[in-house]
Amino acid sequence: MLYLEDYLEMIEQLPMDLRDRFTEMREMDLQVQNAMDQLEQRVSEFFMNAKKNKPEWREEQMASIKKDYYKALEDADEKVQLANQIYDLVDRHLRKLDQELAKFKMELEADNAGITEILERRSLELDAPSQPVNNHHAHSHTPVEKRKYNPTSHHTATDHIPEKKFKSEALLSTLTSDASKENTLGCRNNNSTASCNNAYNVNSSQPLASYNIGSLSSGAGAGAITMAAAQAVQATAQMKEGRRTSSLKASYEAFKNNDFQLGKEFSMPRETAGYSSSSALMTTLTQNASSSAADSRSGRKSKNNTKSSSQQSSSSSSSSSSSSLSLCSSSSTVVQEVSQQTTVVPESDSNSQVDWTYDPNEPRYCICNQVSYGEMVGCDNQDCPIEWFHYGCVGLTEAPKGKWFCPQCTAAMKRRGSRHK
Protein backbone atom coordinates (compact mmCIF):
# COMPACT_ATOMS: atom_id res chain seq x y z
CA MET A 1 0.00 0.00 0.00
CA LEU A 2 3.03 2.30 -0.22
CA TYR A 3 2.75 2.83 -3.96
CA LEU A 4 2.67 6.63 -3.77
CA GLU A 5 5.72 6.88 -1.52
CA ASP A 6 7.69 4.47 -3.69
CA TYR A 7 6.77 6.30 -6.88
CA LEU A 8 7.65 9.71 -5.44
CA GLU A 9 11.01 8.35 -4.35
CA MET A 10 11.58 6.93 -7.82
CA ILE A 11 10.89 10.23 -9.64
CA GLU A 12 12.80 12.36 -7.14
CA GLN A 13 15.80 12.68 -9.50
CA LEU A 14 13.71 12.98 -12.66
CA PRO A 15 13.52 16.83 -12.73
CA MET A 16 17.29 17.13 -12.35
CA ASP A 17 17.90 14.60 -15.13
CA LEU A 18 15.48 16.37 -17.46
CA ARG A 19 17.03 19.76 -16.75
CA ASP A 20 20.55 18.46 -17.48
CA ARG A 21 19.49 16.82 -20.73
CA PHE A 22 17.53 19.87 -21.88
CA THR A 23 20.57 22.04 -21.14
CA GLU A 24 22.74 19.73 -23.20
CA MET A 25 20.22 19.77 -26.03
CA ARG A 26 20.13 23.58 -26.01
CA GLU A 27 23.94 23.75 -26.17
CA MET A 28 23.99 21.35 -29.11
CA ASP A 29 21.31 23.36 -30.86
CA LEU A 30 23.35 26.56 -30.48
CA GLN A 31 26.43 24.74 -31.73
CA VAL A 32 24.62 23.56 -34.86
CA GLN A 33 23.21 27.02 -35.53
CA ASN A 34 26.62 28.67 -35.19
CA ALA A 35 28.17 26.08 -37.50
CA MET A 36 25.46 26.67 -40.12
CA ASP A 37 25.97 30.45 -39.98
CA GLN A 38 29.71 30.07 -40.45
CA LEU A 39 29.22 27.64 -43.32
CA GLU A 40 26.84 29.99 -45.10
CA GLN A 41 29.41 32.76 -44.83
CA ARG A 42 32.15 30.46 -46.16
CA VAL A 43 29.95 29.38 -49.08
CA SER A 44 29.23 32.99 -50.06
CA GLU A 45 32.95 33.84 -49.91
CA PHE A 46 33.77 30.71 -51.91
CA PHE A 47 31.49 31.71 -54.79
CA MET A 48 32.80 35.28 -54.73
CA ASN A 49 36.45 34.15 -55.02
CA ALA A 50 35.95 31.05 -57.18
CA LYS A 51 36.74 32.75 -60.48
CA LYS A 52 39.89 34.39 -59.17
CA ASN A 53 41.59 31.21 -57.87
CA LYS A 54 42.89 28.00 -59.36
CA PRO A 55 40.87 24.78 -59.69
CA GLU A 56 43.00 23.08 -57.03
CA TRP A 57 42.01 25.76 -54.50
CA ARG A 58 38.36 25.37 -55.42
CA GLU A 59 38.46 21.60 -54.94
CA GLU A 60 40.16 21.96 -51.57
CA GLN A 61 37.69 24.55 -50.29
CA MET A 62 34.76 22.49 -51.58
CA ALA A 63 35.94 19.39 -49.73
CA SER A 64 36.46 21.37 -46.52
CA ILE A 65 32.97 22.87 -46.68
CA LYS A 66 31.41 19.45 -47.28
CA LYS A 67 33.29 18.01 -44.31
CA ASP A 68 32.03 20.77 -42.02
CA TYR A 69 28.47 20.28 -43.29
CA TYR A 70 28.62 16.57 -42.44
CA LYS A 71 29.92 17.47 -38.97
CA ALA A 72 26.95 19.79 -38.40
CA LEU A 73 24.61 17.06 -39.65
CA GLU A 74 26.07 14.59 -37.14
CA ASP A 75 25.56 17.09 -34.32
CA ALA A 76 21.94 17.57 -35.38
CA ASP A 77 21.38 13.80 -35.42
CA GLU A 78 22.87 13.54 -31.96
CA LYS A 79 20.48 16.23 -30.74
CA VAL A 80 17.53 14.26 -32.15
CA GLN A 81 18.75 11.10 -30.42
CA LEU A 82 18.98 12.99 -27.14
CA ALA A 83 15.37 14.14 -27.57
CA ASN A 84 14.29 10.55 -28.17
CA GLN A 85 16.09 9.47 -25.00
CA ILE A 86 14.22 12.11 -22.99
CA TYR A 87 10.93 10.92 -24.46
CA ASP A 88 11.71 7.30 -23.57
CA LEU A 89 12.65 8.31 -20.03
CA VAL A 90 9.37 10.12 -19.42
CA ASP A 91 7.37 7.36 -21.11
CA ARG A 92 9.02 4.75 -18.89
CA HIS A 93 7.99 6.65 -15.76
CA LEU A 94 4.43 7.02 -17.07
CA ARG A 95 4.14 3.29 -17.72
CA LYS A 96 5.45 2.63 -14.22
CA LEU A 97 2.77 4.94 -12.82
CA ASP A 98 0.05 3.08 -14.72
CA GLN A 99 1.29 -0.24 -13.38
CA GLU A 100 1.33 1.01 -9.79
CA LEU A 101 -2.19 2.42 -10.18
CA ALA A 102 -3.45 -0.90 -11.52
CA LYS A 103 -1.94 -2.77 -8.55
CA PHE A 104 -3.38 -0.28 -6.08
CA LYS A 105 -6.81 -0.59 -7.71
CA MET A 106 -6.71 -4.38 -7.46
CA GLU A 107 -5.89 -4.21 -3.75
CA LEU A 108 -8.74 -1.77 -3.10
CA GLU A 109 -11.19 -3.96 -5.02
CA ALA A 110 -10.05 -7.00 -3.06
CA ASP A 111 -10.90 -5.28 0.24
CA ASN A 112 -14.04 -3.37 -0.87
CA ALA A 113 -15.72 -4.29 -4.14
CA GLY A 114 -16.79 -1.25 -6.20
CA ILE A 115 -14.88 1.28 -4.07
CA THR A 116 -12.63 2.42 -6.94
CA GLU A 117 -15.57 3.50 -9.09
CA ILE A 118 -16.98 5.57 -6.22
CA LEU A 119 -13.60 7.18 -5.56
CA GLU A 120 -13.06 8.00 -9.23
CA ARG A 121 -16.52 9.55 -9.54
CA ARG A 122 -15.98 11.65 -6.43
CA SER A 123 -12.58 12.77 -7.70
CA LEU A 124 -14.08 13.86 -11.02
CA GLU A 125 -16.77 15.84 -9.20
CA LEU A 126 -14.13 17.63 -7.13
CA ASP A 127 -12.00 18.37 -10.19
CA ALA A 128 -14.93 19.73 -12.21
CA PRO A 129 -15.29 23.56 -12.18
CA SER A 130 -18.14 25.08 -10.19
CA GLN A 131 -19.34 27.13 -13.18
CA PRO A 132 -19.06 26.33 -16.87
CA VAL A 133 -16.21 28.35 -18.31
CA ASN A 134 -16.87 27.88 -22.00
CA ASN A 135 -19.07 30.66 -23.40
CA HIS A 136 -18.53 30.49 -27.13
CA HIS A 137 -18.32 27.41 -29.33
CA ALA A 138 -17.84 26.89 -33.00
CA HIS A 139 -19.77 24.12 -34.71
CA SER A 140 -17.52 21.13 -34.09
CA HIS A 141 -19.33 18.96 -36.65
CA THR A 142 -18.43 21.21 -39.59
CA PRO A 143 -15.11 20.63 -41.36
CA VAL A 144 -12.46 23.22 -40.61
CA GLU A 145 -11.41 25.18 -43.68
CA LYS A 146 -7.86 26.16 -44.45
CA ARG A 147 -8.19 29.78 -43.37
CA LYS A 148 -10.63 29.20 -40.49
CA TYR A 149 -9.51 28.97 -36.89
CA ASN A 150 -11.28 26.43 -34.68
CA PRO A 151 -11.58 27.88 -31.15
CA THR A 152 -12.67 24.59 -29.61
CA SER A 153 -9.00 23.88 -28.88
CA HIS A 154 -9.12 26.61 -26.24
CA HIS A 155 -12.46 25.58 -24.72
CA THR A 156 -13.67 22.36 -23.16
CA ALA A 157 -17.04 21.40 -24.60
CA THR A 158 -19.75 20.23 -22.23
CA ASP A 159 -22.94 18.36 -23.02
CA HIS A 160 -25.33 20.63 -21.14
CA ILE A 161 -24.21 23.90 -22.74
CA PRO A 162 -25.83 24.61 -26.15
CA GLU A 163 -23.70 25.87 -28.99
CA LYS A 164 -24.11 29.59 -29.66
CA LYS A 165 -23.29 31.46 -32.85
CA PHE A 166 -22.94 35.18 -32.36
CA LYS A 167 -24.85 37.63 -34.53
CA SER A 168 -25.69 41.28 -34.06
CA GLU A 169 -29.26 41.30 -35.35
CA ALA A 170 -30.95 39.33 -32.54
CA LEU A 171 -30.57 41.55 -29.49
CA LEU A 172 -29.94 44.81 -31.34
CA SER A 173 -33.24 44.69 -33.22
CA THR A 174 -35.21 44.08 -30.02
CA LEU A 175 -33.40 46.90 -28.24
CA THR A 176 -33.80 49.48 -30.99
CA SER A 177 -37.43 48.59 -31.78
CA ASP A 178 -38.57 48.88 -28.17
CA ALA A 179 -36.63 52.11 -27.73
CA SER A 180 -38.16 53.59 -30.88
CA LYS A 181 -41.66 52.65 -29.66
CA GLU A 182 -41.01 54.42 -26.39
CA ASN A 183 -39.59 57.52 -28.08
CA THR A 184 -42.57 57.67 -30.44
CA LEU A 185 -45.09 57.42 -27.60
CA GLY A 186 -43.22 59.49 -25.02
CA CYS A 187 -41.60 62.26 -27.04
CA ARG A 188 -44.18 63.34 -29.64
CA ASN A 189 -46.70 64.47 -27.03
CA ASN A 190 -44.62 67.29 -25.55
CA ASN A 191 -47.39 69.49 -24.19
CA SER A 192 -47.14 68.46 -20.54
CA THR A 193 -45.67 65.90 -18.18
CA ALA A 194 -48.97 64.05 -17.96
CA SER A 195 -48.98 63.20 -21.67
CA CYS A 196 -45.46 61.75 -21.43
CA ASN A 197 -46.46 59.81 -18.32
CA ASN A 198 -49.50 58.38 -20.11
CA ALA A 199 -47.25 57.26 -22.94
CA TYR A 200 -45.04 55.40 -20.49
CA ASN A 201 -48.10 53.77 -18.90
CA VAL A 202 -49.42 52.64 -22.29
CA ASN A 203 -46.04 51.24 -23.24
CA SER A 204 -45.57 49.47 -19.94
CA SER A 205 -48.97 47.80 -20.08
CA GLN A 206 -47.77 45.57 -22.92
CA PRO A 207 -45.76 42.42 -22.12
CA LEU A 208 -42.06 42.94 -22.81
CA ALA A 209 -39.58 40.34 -24.06
CA SER A 210 -36.67 39.13 -22.00
CA TYR A 211 -33.30 40.63 -22.89
CA ASN A 212 -31.12 37.83 -21.45
CA ILE A 213 -28.08 39.97 -20.60
CA GLY A 214 -26.48 38.44 -17.49
CA SER A 215 -28.76 39.15 -14.53
CA LEU A 216 -31.10 41.37 -16.63
CA SER A 217 -34.67 40.28 -15.90
CA SER A 218 -37.65 40.60 -18.20
CA GLY A 219 -40.09 43.50 -18.37
CA ALA A 220 -37.74 46.33 -17.51
CA GLY A 221 -38.75 48.75 -20.28
CA ALA A 222 -36.73 50.11 -23.20
CA GLY A 223 -36.04 53.42 -21.46
CA ALA A 224 -34.15 51.77 -18.64
CA ILE A 225 -32.25 49.69 -21.19
CA THR A 226 -31.13 52.78 -23.07
CA MET A 227 -30.11 54.54 -19.85
CA ALA A 228 -28.00 51.51 -18.94
CA ALA A 229 -26.55 51.43 -22.44
CA ALA A 230 -25.60 55.11 -22.14
CA GLN A 231 -23.57 54.45 -19.01
CA ALA A 232 -22.04 51.33 -20.61
CA VAL A 233 -20.95 53.23 -23.72
CA GLN A 234 -19.48 56.01 -21.59
CA ALA A 235 -17.49 53.51 -19.50
CA THR A 236 -16.32 51.70 -22.64
CA ALA A 237 -15.16 54.96 -24.22
CA GLN A 238 -12.98 55.64 -21.18
CA MET A 239 -11.11 52.32 -21.63
CA LYS A 240 -7.73 52.11 -23.34
CA GLU A 241 -7.78 51.80 -27.10
CA GLY A 242 -6.47 48.24 -27.10
CA ARG A 243 -9.02 47.06 -24.57
CA ARG A 244 -12.15 48.19 -26.41
CA THR A 245 -14.37 45.48 -27.81
CA SER A 246 -16.98 45.35 -30.51
CA SER A 247 -19.23 42.94 -28.67
CA LEU A 248 -21.71 43.47 -25.86
CA LYS A 249 -19.31 41.92 -23.36
CA ALA A 250 -17.73 45.30 -22.64
CA SER A 251 -21.17 46.82 -22.15
CA TYR A 252 -22.06 44.10 -19.71
CA GLU A 253 -18.83 44.63 -17.76
CA ALA A 254 -19.60 48.35 -17.70
CA PHE A 255 -23.06 47.57 -16.29
CA LYS A 256 -21.48 45.63 -13.45
CA ASN A 257 -18.73 48.16 -12.69
CA ASN A 258 -20.94 51.26 -12.93
CA ASP A 259 -23.29 52.74 -10.34
CA PHE A 260 -26.27 51.51 -12.34
CA GLN A 261 -27.21 48.42 -10.29
CA LEU A 262 -28.76 45.79 -12.56
CA GLY A 263 -29.57 43.45 -9.71
CA LYS A 264 -31.82 46.02 -8.05
CA GLU A 265 -33.27 47.69 -11.14
CA PHE A 266 -34.19 44.57 -13.12
CA SER A 267 -35.06 42.00 -10.44
CA MET A 268 -38.84 42.63 -10.49
CA PRO A 269 -41.14 39.85 -11.78
CA ARG A 270 -43.01 39.97 -15.08
CA GLU A 271 -46.43 40.52 -13.47
CA THR A 272 -45.45 43.70 -11.61
CA ALA A 273 -43.00 45.03 -14.17
CA GLY A 274 -45.67 46.86 -16.16
CA TYR A 275 -46.72 49.92 -14.20
CA SER A 276 -44.02 49.88 -11.54
CA SER A 277 -41.12 50.05 -14.01
CA SER A 278 -42.68 52.94 -15.93
CA SER A 279 -43.57 54.86 -12.77
CA ALA A 280 -40.09 54.34 -11.33
CA LEU A 281 -38.54 55.50 -14.59
CA MET A 282 -40.80 58.56 -14.70
CA THR A 283 -39.92 59.39 -11.09
CA THR A 284 -36.23 59.23 -11.98
CA LEU A 285 -36.74 61.48 -14.97
CA THR A 286 -38.69 64.07 -12.99
CA GLN A 287 -36.15 64.01 -10.17
CA ASN A 288 -33.31 64.60 -12.62
CA ALA A 289 -35.26 67.35 -14.31
CA SER A 290 -36.16 69.09 -11.05
CA SER A 291 -32.57 68.85 -9.80
CA SER A 292 -31.25 70.34 -13.04
CA ALA A 293 -33.81 73.11 -12.84
CA ALA A 294 -32.84 73.81 -9.23
CA ASP A 295 -29.17 73.98 -10.18
CA SER A 296 -29.87 76.41 -12.98
CA ARG A 297 -31.88 78.65 -10.67
CA SER A 298 -29.35 78.52 -7.80
CA GLY A 299 -27.33 81.48 -9.12
CA ARG A 300 -30.33 83.73 -9.51
CA LYS A 301 -32.11 85.80 -6.87
CA SER A 302 -35.87 85.61 -6.74
CA LYS A 303 -37.38 89.08 -7.20
CA ASN A 304 -40.97 88.09 -6.59
CA ASN A 305 -41.80 85.82 -3.66
CA THR A 306 -45.58 86.05 -4.02
CA LYS A 307 -46.03 83.76 -7.01
CA SER A 308 -48.96 81.40 -6.86
CA SER A 309 -48.58 77.66 -6.43
CA SER A 310 -50.23 77.04 -9.77
CA GLN A 311 -47.52 79.00 -11.59
CA GLN A 312 -44.79 77.11 -9.74
CA SER A 313 -46.37 73.76 -10.54
CA SER A 314 -46.83 74.70 -14.19
CA SER A 315 -43.21 75.88 -14.50
CA SER A 316 -41.86 72.76 -12.81
CA SER A 317 -44.02 70.52 -15.00
CA SER A 318 -42.84 72.29 -18.16
CA SER A 319 -39.19 71.98 -17.11
CA SER A 320 -39.76 68.32 -16.24
CA SER A 321 -41.34 67.75 -19.63
CA SER A 322 -38.44 69.42 -21.47
CA SER A 323 -35.86 67.46 -19.48
CA SER A 324 -37.78 64.24 -20.09
CA LEU A 325 -37.83 64.98 -23.81
CA SER A 326 -34.08 65.66 -23.81
CA LEU A 327 -33.47 62.39 -21.98
CA CYS A 328 -35.65 60.55 -24.50
CA SER A 329 -33.69 62.04 -27.40
CA SER A 330 -30.38 61.21 -25.72
CA SER A 331 -31.62 57.65 -25.19
CA SER A 332 -32.32 57.24 -28.89
CA THR A 333 -28.87 58.66 -29.69
CA VAL A 334 -27.28 56.14 -27.33
CA VAL A 335 -29.16 53.29 -29.02
CA GLN A 336 -27.74 54.40 -32.36
CA GLU A 337 -24.21 54.52 -30.91
CA VAL A 338 -24.62 51.05 -29.44
CA SER A 339 -25.91 49.71 -32.77
CA GLN A 340 -22.89 51.22 -34.57
CA GLN A 341 -20.31 49.91 -32.10
CA THR A 342 -21.82 46.46 -31.65
CA THR A 343 -20.99 43.79 -34.20
CA VAL A 344 -21.50 40.50 -32.38
CA VAL A 345 -24.15 39.62 -29.83
CA PRO A 346 -25.40 36.22 -28.67
CA GLU A 347 -28.40 34.55 -30.26
CA SER A 348 -30.22 32.75 -27.45
CA ASP A 349 -33.71 31.62 -26.54
CA SER A 350 -35.97 33.87 -24.50
CA ASN A 351 -35.98 31.45 -21.58
CA SER A 352 -32.19 31.03 -21.39
CA GLN A 353 -29.60 33.49 -20.16
CA VAL A 354 -26.17 34.17 -21.59
CA ASP A 355 -23.29 33.22 -19.30
CA TRP A 356 -20.47 35.73 -19.76
CA THR A 357 -18.11 34.02 -17.30
CA TYR A 358 -14.75 33.23 -18.89
CA ASP A 359 -11.32 32.20 -17.72
CA PRO A 360 -9.12 35.25 -16.99
CA ASN A 361 -6.05 33.23 -17.99
CA GLU A 362 -7.50 32.42 -21.39
CA PRO A 363 -5.41 33.85 -24.26
CA ARG A 364 -6.69 36.96 -26.05
CA TYR A 365 -6.76 37.51 -29.78
CA CYS A 366 -7.85 40.01 -32.43
CA ILE A 367 -7.77 43.82 -32.38
CA CYS A 368 -10.57 43.76 -29.79
CA ASN A 369 -8.27 41.87 -27.36
CA GLN A 370 -10.94 39.26 -26.53
CA VAL A 371 -11.03 35.48 -26.23
CA SER A 372 -11.58 33.27 -29.26
CA TYR A 373 -15.17 32.70 -30.36
CA GLY A 374 -17.07 32.17 -33.58
CA GLU A 375 -15.14 32.02 -36.83
CA MET A 376 -11.60 33.43 -36.87
CA VAL A 377 -9.06 34.09 -39.62
CA GLY A 378 -5.28 33.95 -39.33
CA CYS A 379 -2.82 36.52 -40.70
CA ASP A 380 -0.29 35.11 -43.19
CA ASN A 381 2.45 37.35 -41.83
CA GLN A 382 4.70 35.14 -39.68
CA ASP A 383 5.74 38.13 -37.56
CA CYS A 384 2.17 39.30 -36.86
CA PRO A 385 1.86 40.01 -33.10
CA ILE A 386 -1.88 39.19 -32.99
CA GLU A 387 -2.10 36.33 -35.56
CA TRP A 388 -5.84 35.49 -35.15
CA PHE A 389 -8.81 37.81 -35.80
CA HIS A 390 -12.60 37.56 -35.53
CA TYR A 391 -14.44 37.78 -38.83
CA GLY A 392 -16.60 40.70 -37.67
CA CYS A 393 -13.68 42.76 -36.35
CA VAL A 394 -11.86 42.74 -39.71
CA GLY A 395 -14.96 43.00 -41.91
CA LEU A 396 -15.04 39.42 -43.22
CA THR A 397 -18.10 37.26 -43.79
CA GLU A 398 -16.41 34.18 -45.30
CA ALA A 399 -12.96 32.62 -45.51
CA PRO A 400 -10.61 34.67 -47.74
CA LYS A 401 -9.12 33.07 -50.81
CA GLY A 402 -5.35 32.95 -51.00
CA LYS A 403 -3.16 34.83 -48.58
CA TRP A 404 -4.74 37.31 -46.17
CA PHE A 405 -3.00 39.99 -44.09
CA CYS A 406 -4.48 41.89 -41.16
CA PRO A 407 -4.98 45.69 -41.35
CA GLN A 408 -1.89 46.38 -39.20
CA CYS A 409 0.41 44.22 -41.33
CA THR A 410 -1.09 45.65 -44.53
CA ALA A 411 -0.40 49.21 -43.36
CA ALA A 412 3.15 48.25 -42.32
CA MET A 413 3.84 46.69 -45.73
CA LYS A 414 2.51 49.78 -47.48
CA ARG A 415 4.78 51.99 -45.40
CA ARG A 416 7.79 49.83 -46.21
CA GLY A 417 6.89 49.89 -49.91
CA SER A 418 6.57 53.67 -50.00
CA ARG A 419 9.86 54.02 -48.10
CA HIS A 420 11.71 51.89 -50.68
CA LYS A 421 10.31 54.00 -53.49
UniProtKB/Swiss-Prot annotation:
Covalent cross-link Glycyl lysine isopeptide (Lys-Gly) (interchain with G-Cter in SUMO2) as placed by the record, residue numbers: 148, 165, 167, 256
Residue numbers bearing the N6-acetyllysine modification: 181, 264
Record key words, sorted: Acetylation, Chromatin regulator, Growth regulation, Isopeptide bond, Metal-binding, Nucleus, Transcription, Transcription regulation, Ubl conjugation, Zinc, Zinc-finger
Residues that span the membrane, as ranges: none
ZnF region ranges: PHD-type: 363-412
Record flagged with keyword Repressor: no
Gene Ontology process terms (BP): positive regulation of double-strand break repair via homologous recombination; regulation of cell cycle
Main location: nucleus
Name of one Pfam family that matches: ING
GO molecular function annotation: histone H4K12 acetyltransferase activity; histone H4K16 acetyltransferase activity; histone H4K5 acetyltransferase activity; histone H4K8 acetyltransferase activity; methylated histone binding; zinc ion binding
Note on domains (UniProt): The PHD-type zinc finger mediates the binding to H3K4me3.
Protein name: Inhibitor of growth protein 3
Species of provenance: Rattus norvegicus (Rat)
